[in-house]
Amino acid sequence: MAIWDRLFKQRQRSKRSYIAAKPSRLFNDFKTTSISADSAIRFNLRELRDKSRDQARNNDYAKRYLQLLVTNVVGQKGIRLQSKARNERNQLETVANKFIEDAWNKWSKKGNCTVDGKLSFIDCQKLFMESLARDGEVLIRYFNTNDPQNPFKIQFLDADYLDEKKNQTKKDGGNIIMGVEMDEFNKPLQYYLYAEHPNDVYFRKKSKQHEIVSADDILHAYMA
């Protein structure tokens, strides 16, 4: 009987799973699709992003959500570095760790970490979280500058800089999907960025020209 009960329960579970997949009045509100996420948003991405930004500007609930998100994820002091380098005897290198942390704290100050000198690293963290939640993605570009004290810097790019209409099948087996060139294993290789913001009326001549940037110089975070 125990074997029969087990088989019966398995059949019941299978039956329930098939029922859940069948259309009925209980599931009419569920929108089903078999296409990829990229295909689903490819032709509507810019409009969806514009609507989300409008809500972030004008909807009190959306504004409050972004404020709470930044406050609870980043916090007042932000995410900080604590170096715990150890020597060959597994002892903490106090002097080296202090040197590393001091250098990090110096780089994190306003004027040192971004190419335009306008943000501190805490500001960057807040902007990262807000942009990710509002726009669905974040683009950060890496730069090695001539600054002798802090040569490495970052630049936040508006998501609109990425040409989502750039799509192409490559002969080598790779693809360009929504402005991102990838190899046959979907590893990002290059990013097709507009030379100027595509909606900036002051740069119409360059706004449609591309700057191809290596994926090694781009941090592209997005909500899947």
Feature names for model-found ranges:
Residues 2-68, 129-224:
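Structured, contiguous alpha/beta core segments that scaffold functional sites
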Residues 32-35, 39-133:
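Extended assembly-interface regions of large multimeric machines
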